[in-house]
Amino acid sequence: MRLILIRHAEPDYVRDSLTEKGWREAELLSERVSGWDVTEFFCSPLGRAKDTASKTLKKMNRTAVTADWLSEFSCQVKNPVTGQMTSPWEYIPSDWTSDPLMYDSEAWTNSEICSSNPEVGRKYRLICREMDRMLETYGYIRDKNIYRVRGKKEQYIIHTPAPDEPEKMEMLPEGNEPCIVIFAHFGVISSILSHLLNIPFVLLAHAAFFPASSVTVLSAEERWGNEAYF
């Protein structure tokens, strides 16, 4: 399976739409996406994500599943250093890195900062739960920190086959894997990646950056039994 996560183009947050530059980004993005063999599209219900997706969907004559759980985080927390209310990923490095819970992919929501607003944990868990439900419709069942592919013919490939290993090359997928494209937001994309890669949310959100109209591609590694890991 291939998962492609697209952040909305440059936003006009006041109108919940796109700036003039954002519309140009969305058009250029559509030229790239329209060349893909996409199984299904998903999109946040917020205007800036829907507007970004609209160019691609029109060009491909497709529709997207609008999913409320893909809406951006609306909850905020009080930054203990600045005293300001901020998104639950805008922290001072020397502050959040001093809390061991921030390095736990499950317990980070119990950290002193994040637990100050229980909605942060609830939103994160909602995204993770709904992501797993969507993957399950394609046969990918969460099993602790990996996925198991329902009905998949088991095979065991120790290393990536080289071109001079034809008998092993034949065992690789033939390219007909499902391809899912999701139009969403920074916090949502960070949450999905945190869950799939088993990386603490705050750590990932500070270590990686997903600019407007960015494209993040995950491909499931499926070479050992019925196991899959993104």
Predicted regions, residues:
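Active-site metal-binding loops of divalent metal-dependent hydrolases
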Residues: A9, F186
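Short catalytic helix/loop segments, enriched in acidic residues and glycine
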Residues: L18-S34
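Extreme N-terminal starter segment of soluble prokaryotic enzymes
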Residues: M1-I4
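Short N-terminal binding/cap micro-motifs at the start of the first secondary-structure element
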Residues: D12-S17
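Acidic, low-complexity terminal tails and accessory targeting/binding regions
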Residues: F73-Y91, V149-C179, S191-F230
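Internal catalytic-core helix/loop-beta-alpha segment
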Residues: I113-E167
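Phosphate-coordination/substrate-recognition cap region in phosphate-metabolizing enzymes
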Residues: S30-P118
